[in-house]
Design a protein with these regions (language model features):
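Extended beta-strand/beta-hairpin segments
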Residues: 1-25, 29-108
Length: 108
């Protein structure tokens, strides 16, 4: 159980946030590639990192997610637009919309 929830933290063990991050980033990257393909944009070198945190909210505990797109070869504006478009179609994004805070960013 995570330390934030009163547990020992289990150093070296995979925690629920890491598992959620792995699933969300993989799903979002696939959505990003699909959207980019429709728009004829080359994202062969693209990757997505999900940073997931857990903390107290008004009713107990909640998640917070930052999705970071690594989109070499695209202008920042293009990359931001693709991230937004992928967020609209990604199944994880749809499932969490309105339930948790999700921020999108593009890596430098």
């Amino acid at each position: 159980m995570p330390k934030e929830m009163g547990g020992p933290g289990d150093e070296g063990a995979t925690n629920p946030e890491q598992l959620f991050a792995a699933g969300y980033s993989a799903c979002f990257e696939n959505a990003l590639r699909r959207v980019a393909g429709r728009q004829k944009k080359n994202v062969r070198e693209a990757s997505v990192t999900a940073n997931v945190g857990i903390g107290r909210d008004g009713n107990g505990f909640g998640l917070k997610v930052e999705l970071v797109g690594h989109l070499p070869g695209l202008q920042r504006e293009e990359a931001e637009a693709l991230m937004h478009d992928a967020h609209e179609v990604c199944p994880y994004s749809k499932a969490t919309r309105g339930n948790i805070e999700v921020t999108l960013s593009v890596a430098e």
